[in-house]
Amino acid sequence: MALLEDIINFATLNPMVVVAIPVFLFVISLLRSYLRLAHIPGPFAAGWTNLPRFSWVLSFKAHDIHTALHRKYGPLVRFGPNMVSVGDPKEVGHIYGFTDPWMKSDFYHALLMKPRGKPIPGIFAAQDENIHRALKKPISSAYSMSTLLSFEPYVDSTMRVFCEQLESRFIENKKPLDFGKWLQMFAFDVIGELTFSRRLGFLESGEDINHVMANIWETFKKTSLVTQMPWLDKLWTNNPIQRWRRGGGASPGAAFAMARVEERRELQRTTNKNDWHFNTRDFLSRFMEAEAKDPSIPPYALAAWASSNITAGSDTTGIFLRTIFYQLLTHPETLRKLREELDQAAAAGNLDDLASWKQTRELPYLDAVIKEGGRIHPPFGLPYERVVPAQGATICGKFLPGGTLVGMSAWVVHRNKELYGEDCDEWNPDRWLKCDTEKRRKMENALLTFGAGHRTCMGKHIAYLEMYKVVPTLLRKYDVSRLLCFLVSRTG
């Protein structure tokens, strides 16, 4: 007690001590943080602060910078004081496996819906495994491939509208078009059909309805930065002013989906029915059925499910489609090979003008093109972060203490030369065909296009259903090799 009084008296008589003590403690804390992962190579500044990785994302070149850093430093690279990026494909199962899953980091907090500032868990961003399980279990069957095949007529309907709009707006008038924009609008209208039994109106209007696409992009630009320094969320993206600008705090995609949910609830109240006479039950009908059957489902679940479909289901598919057509346009030999395969299948009576899922699954070169599209330009450009369990873990031969943040970037893993070859930076669908079964299995298992393990994106089958149908259909109908000028019909 006397010693404590002496220290207090000394500090009172020496004001500099009051300043020096917290500075000293801060420096000690900083040193401990740095030394904790000093055995992991990486940029010097990244050992002291998260500002470098924040700046990489700010540059819009984080995916390329991450790849370059791994080629310089090896399979483990320190991205921050407590963050290690892993680039070895063999570690995918270790970090993202189905057994003993590692918890998601605070990276995902920035991706949560926050109506009125309060975060609402979603299937993708939920950190608590119990919450994730409670949200996923009631609706997981709706995302199975067998169930999604019952949705194929919805995709067909939107594809017909897509083709009609291309022909009336551009082919007949020989006008140039922004094909990437139209592929994105197609993806939005498909997910609208699947989720709400109606297109969202992008294709018919030829416009970004309510600026949803632009607003989602702006939101992603901000949240991607905040994921690197999660404490910024309340200061920047979720402060009262931003919540007011968003009309109560919901992100653009979430607000759009929640409005559609309220429309359906109002229809249910006024008609007093659970069946709105749709030919096929859409996602929202299935979500509401699940909610009605299980009173334990939290009240926010319906909005979380619907908004996930709109926000994630449209953007990732749009990116994927743009990638494939860009690569086909810039690699004429690939386009020629794929068109040849499609024409031969059609001549044999095995491919309709409106391609079906069953038919396209028998086309190996199309399969290779789509796999290569997901490999060379995965939609998600940042590492999928996880927290090392309390006991620590050995990754790539080095021990990482419990609580360390680790993550694998699809861009880094997909450019692993040992697995994908010296030409891994190049577009080459043949890599999936000119290899043995074991090599192909390893390459497929390392694909992180839609994540990995038990937290793999539930909507990946939706994306594949669209791609395996729309790519061959458009290539059969139109000469896309002339897209740099204008789109023309292949039939005259």
Curated annotation (Swiss-Prot):
It is found in: Membrane. This is Cytochrome P450 monooxygenase ATEG_03631. The keyword Nucleus does not apply. CDD domains: CYP57A1-like (cd11060). Cytochrome P450 monooxygenase; part of the cluster A that mediates the biosynthesis of azasperpyranones, members of the azaphilone family that exhibit anti-cancer activities. Azasperpyranones are synthesized by 2 clusters, A and B. Cluster A is responsible for the production of the polyhydric phenol moiety while the azaphilonoid scaffold is produced by the cluster B. The non-reducing polyketide synthase ATEG_03629 produces 5-methyl orsellinic acid, which is then reduced to 5-methyl orsellinic aldehyde by the NRPS-like protein ATEG_03630. Pathway: Secondary metabolite biosynthesis. The chain crosses the membrane at residues 10-30. GO terms for cellular component: membrane.
